[in-house]
Curated annotation (Swiss-Prot):
Belongs to the hook family. This is Protein Hook homolog 3. Keywords: Cytoplasm, Cytoskeleton, Golgi apparatus, Microtubule, Protein transport, Transport. One of its GO terms (biological process) is protein transport. Signal peptide: none annotated. GO terms for molecular function: dynactin binding; dynein intermediate chain binding. The lineage of its organism: Eukaryota, Metazoa, Chordata, Craniata, Vertebrata. GO terms for cellular component: FHF complex; Golgi apparatus; microtubule. It is found in: Cytoplasm, Cytoskeleton; Golgi apparatus.
Length: 12
């Protein structure tokens, strides 16, 4: 899922 990946990346 690219959406979750992006959210995870922004969280860090």
């Amino acid at each position: 899922v690219e959406l979750q990946n992006r959210l995870s990346d922004e969280s860090q």
